[in-house]
Structures are given as structure tokens and as C-alpha cells.
């Protein structure tokens, strides 16, 4: 795949291991397979770990990522705003954080399990057991971030 007679250079950004609880190998395989598919189409692909992508101030016109780190997401937003094509948009990543996603689904009347967003400082009284209690400020990072509760 060429652009103006030159190979298209694509930047890939891997997900930090801390954001892939129990799925480090799976996430690495997904990114590797995407990179290999782009290379078969003639692209030149360079993969960077999240922290290196930010620390080295990497730029690119075409970027694909599995980012979750806040600094990486902010860097991707700046690149997107500057015209880079980012597959797995940083804005989309932010919209998939549990609280934001739940609020968007409910506000747009998308069918969604009954959900409550509460502060950990608040008393939770609705009788909705059994239920799932999920971390709201981020994606699950440890197994305890998503817990099934059968009764009070």
C-alpha cells in the first residue's frame, strides 16, 4: 500500500500489561495480527509500548492502538486533533470507560442492563440483588474490579 509512491508508515501502540489483567498474551496477539495484516498490504508498521509512545513523543499520520493509559490517550487525542487518522480513537476509548459508557447508553435510550452509578462514599439501598458491582472510573485492571454479589 503506497501513498504518492511511498510506503505508508503506520504506528501501532500496544496496551500496557497492567491494563490487560489475565489477557496480556491475547492483547499482544491482537495487535501483532493487525500489524501483520497491514504489512501484508505493504505498509511499514512500527509498534511502540504505551509508555515509550508518550515518552518519545512519537508522531504518525496513521495510528492504530490498544491504549488505556491516561497519558497515552491524551497524546492520541492531540494527534487526532492535529489530523492523524487514529484507529481506536482516543475519544472512543474515553467513551468506553464504564461510567461514561453507561451514561451515554442510558441518555441515548440504548437497551442496557439496569445500572446505578454511585459514589463509594454513598449508601446504596436499592434491592437489586443479585447484581454486578463494577469499577466505574476505569476499565477493569484486577479481577476485583468486577464482582458478582448474590445478597446483602
Task: For the regions a language model picked out, list residue spans one by one.
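ATP-binding N-terminal substructure of ATP-dependent carboxylate-amine bond-forming enzymes
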Residues: 1-87, 92
Amino acid at each position: 500500500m503506497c501513498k504518492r509512491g511511498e510506503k505508508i508508515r503506520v504506528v501501532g501502540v500496544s496496551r500496557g500489561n497492567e491494563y490487560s489483567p489475565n489477557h496480556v498474551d491475547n492483547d499482544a496477539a491482537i495487535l501483532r495480527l493487525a500489524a501483520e495484516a497491514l504489512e501484508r498490504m505493504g505498509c511499514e508498521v512500527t509498534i511502540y509500548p504505551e509508555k515509550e509512545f508518550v515518552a518519545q513523543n512519537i508522531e504518525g499520520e496513521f495510528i492504530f492502538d490498544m491504549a488505556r493509559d491516561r497519558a497515552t490517550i491524551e497524546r492520541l487525542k492531540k494527534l487526532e486533533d492535529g489530523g492523524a487518522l487514529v484507529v481506536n480513537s482516543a475519544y472512543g476509548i474515553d467513551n468506553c470507560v464504564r461510567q461514561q459508557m453507561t451514561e451515554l447508553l442510558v441518555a441515548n435510550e440504548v437497551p442496557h442492563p439496569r445500572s446505578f452509578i454511585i459514589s463509594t462514599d454513598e449508601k446504596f439501598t436499592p434491592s437489586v440483588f443479585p447484581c454486578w458491582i463494577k469499577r466505574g472510573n476505569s476499565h477493569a485492571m484486577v479481577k476485583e474490579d468486577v464482582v458478582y454479589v448474590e445478597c446483602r
